[in-house]
């Protein structure tokens, strides 16, 4: 059986695969993600299509250099008409949380499988995230509690920890919110001979 490789630096994606009992190695793709996003936007691609394109680019990049089946994954946050990138500072995080307060945004999680530089499969799932109204005092307390670790998450939250306090409704798959729609991915891995038994 060929090795399984995760082409992502995401700790949450790695944790999901580990918790699912998969043996894999992590080899993050060295890509200019902003350039891929900008190219997709220039072509008029939807946010969901951009998430797929990012996942495919990561999987193809790593699979061209390393033998095995490679999982690429990426997540795009759509707020109104904008695609949101990770905040680079706590001030940017505060501004984003203020902007998201009382609004609904969408997480589009793309995933792809590639082997030997050839795409095997790709897909994306979406989740609708309704943020409750957040007071400035709550935002400050939240950022103080989470610290700068929150800058590693595109929406400045991790649903599996303190981030759950931001929401009053979520529609969509939990794994999609965490950045890797696990059930369709596991089905494809079984199709390619990767399973527990």
Language model features: what each stretch is:
Residues 69-75:
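Alpha-helical membrane segments and adjacent membrane-interface helices in multi-pass membrane proteins
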Residues 1-69, 83, 137, 144, ...:
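N-terminal polybasic phosphate/anion-binding patch
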Residues 122-196:
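Active-site oxyanion/phosphate-handling segment shared across diverse enzymes
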Residues 78, 112-115, 132, 169:
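Short beta-strand-to-turn element immediately C-terminal to the catalytic PLP-Schiff-base lysine
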Residues 75-105, 131-133:
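Active-site-adjacent loop/tail segments of enzyme domains
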Residues 110-122, 126-127:
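Anionic-ligand binding region
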Residues 17, 55, 74, 93, ...:
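Residue-level signal for inorganic ion chemistry
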